[in-house]
Amino acid sequence: DLNHDGKIDDNDKTAIGYPSYPLLNAGLTLGFEYKGFDFSMLWVGATKTSRVLEETFRKPLGETYDRSLMSHQFTDRWTPETAATAKLPRATIDGVKNNYRDSELWVKDASYLRLKNIEIGYNFRLPFMPKIGMEKMRVFMTGYNLLTFDKLKISDPESMSSGVPQYPVMRVINFGLNVSF
């Protein structure tokens, strides 16, 4: 009851959370070379940003045809038996009920820290290389999106559309060999 009139209604609305675009972005690049080895990594992150979970998360019995029923939407919902442990309001098919309105329950912290890129390599200097006209030979391993630390958990926090279910961010690991003649 934000306006202290003794009832909870539309007059008790207030702004919650942060914008969907981050108010603070950061990045850090580290790297070194030592005795033929090279290493680099890029960390990116953002904070002071929120996501409002959309209808798919709020209304598992919902009003749209693309329902991807997530088991937690039922196991974590309020029932008389789970009244003390429920994390979500009771499931209804009526979308205008108060438990589906915007509230702190549906606004999630989308701050994150991600290891966006990491690469380790080794440059060979072998006696046979000049004899065959080889200038350089390097082996390497590169990884993309290998680690993400976030509170959102249900979606990619870096995506502006993370209020809806989506395919997870792809992790990629590449191995390679560069040879120069």
List where the protein language model places each region:
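Repeated loop/turn-to-beta-strand initiation elements of outer-membrane beta-barrel proteins
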Residues: 36-40, 127-128
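Outer-envelope beta-barrel architecture signal
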Residues: 24-26, 35-37, 111, 133-137, ...
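Membrane-embedded beta-strand positions of outer-membrane beta-barrel proteins
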Residues: 41, 139-141, 177
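Conserved small-residue
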Residues: 1-20, 61, 70, 78-80
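Membrane-embedded beta-strand positions in outer-membrane beta-barrel channels/transporters
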Residues: 27-29, 117-121, 174-176
